[in-house]
């Protein structure tokens, strides 16, 4: 007869994994960064929308300030997907310009320089799915005087300005001469 140890050991390992893995009950992940866009501003944050399979569901975005019990909830209907859902997606690119679409929810009226925890709860029909709670922080406010103006007036800008000024002078001078010669005939 086989020893019951492997069965007991496996069951205990599974129980420990279920208990110790944080956030194991979350159904989907949300992201805050895309590499193309900084979603953080001084008084607002951009959060990716819930996944496409939740289109049409009622989403509740929960924003909780770190070290505070105050919770702000915002509700909206998950918009339909048009292709892959990314925070920023290229819609059209050609002839020197690129059109992008921003697929994000903007959380507004936040305090500058503060850490927040953000999560979704989406109800679609009889099913309810939730996201993991992700931390995001707003930028602190900076005085306008403290923002560095490196390269405010570069040498290239000065040269271009001088060349354009000389060209405009010559153009106006040529126009005056052409009008004067045309009026004499």
Curated annotation (Swiss-Prot):
GO CC term (a single one): membrane
UniProt subunit comment: Interacts with uroplakin-1a (UPK1A).
| Keywords (A to Z) from UniProt | Cell membrane, Cleavage on pair of basic residues, Glycoprotein, Membrane, Signal, Transmembrane, Transmembrane helix
Cross-referenced CDD domains, in alphabetical order? UP_II (cd09967)
Maturation-removed propeptide residues: 27-85
* Membrane topology field: Single-pass type I membrane protein
| The protein's name | Uroplakin-2
| Molecular function as annotated in GO | structural molecule activity
What job does this protein perform?
A: Component of the asymmetric unit membrane (AUM); a highly specialized biomembrane elaborated by terminally differentiated urothelial cells. May play an important role in regulating the assembly of the AUM.
Q: What is its main location?
A: membrane
Q: Which residues lie on this side of the membrane: Lumenal?
A: 86-156
The protein's recorded glycosylation sites are 29, 58, 67
Q: What tissues is it present in?
A: Bladder epithelium.
Species this protein is from? Bos taurus
Q: Which residues cross the membrane?
A: 157-177
Where does this protein reside within or beyond the cell? Cell membrane
Q: Where is the signal peptide?
A: 1-26
Q: Which GO terms describe its biological process?
A: epithelial cell differentiation
